[in-house]
Amino acid sequence: MPQQIELRDIALQAAQPLVHGVSLTLQRGRVLALVGGSGSGKSLTCAAALGILPAGVRQTAGEILADGKPVSPCALRGIKIATIMQNPRSAFNPLHTMHTHARETCLALGKPADDATLTAAIEAVGLENAARVLKLYPFEMSGGMLQRMMIAMAVLCESPFIIADEPTTDLDVVAQARILDLLESIMQKQAPGMLLVTHDMGVVARLADDVAVMSDGKIVEQGDVETLFNAPKHAVTRSLVSAHLALYGMELAS
């Protein structure tokens, strides 16, 4: 399994250019946070890495490399990169139970799909009464439960890399804290490389090792999390950090 995945000079276009020469490097055991405002190109960049660009959007430049060798996004998706999506409800077939979803995921990746394996993954993400959960349909579960189920699926994949696209969006404070606890636990136990897409600098401060800031389809600043919080250089970064500090009655040093 690869130890590093690199997005190199990725450019995306629809009727007009959307993402301009984005380069990111994911390393096993480290969390890279990709931050920026809505429409900055974060989710499109993730879609390019997974080979799931929306209709009308095409990649016009750049490549993806695994341990320095060019690779197709389709060869990475699922096997080498697990995904935790922004809207978990849209990721599940409403006609299938959680048992069917989990079992089919495992079988597609050649992983064990016995009930004991599925139950262990569900219990690992804090969902009580795994036997009952496996019988549930998506409409019978809350957003927080579905997000935890998404994380359970990522655990089942045993992929060396994870892309988590706004994993705490639209969840209440308690559910957000639980999801962050789970992501932290995965990093400690499995040490994948994680691309964490978020607009919440509190999430960045808690989980990230490195940060890349996007604005208007470009990476405008990139570095380790401590340096970025203590000495942000770009105006967009300074704005994000200042807004976060203001929540605690603090100000960014001049």
UniProtKB/Swiss-Prot annotation:
The complex is composed of two ATP-binding proteins (NikD and NikE), two transmembrane proteins (NikB and NikC) and a solute-binding protein (NikA). It is a peripheral membrane protein. This is Nickel import ATP-binding protein NikD. Its EC number is 7.2.2.11. It comes from Shigella dysenteriae serotype 1 (strain Sd197). ATP binds at residues 36-43. Its main location: membrane. Residues 2-241 form the ABC transporter domain. Keywords: ATP-binding, Cell inner membrane, Cell membrane, Ion transport, Membrane, Nickel, Nickel transport, Nucleotide-binding, Translocase, Transport.
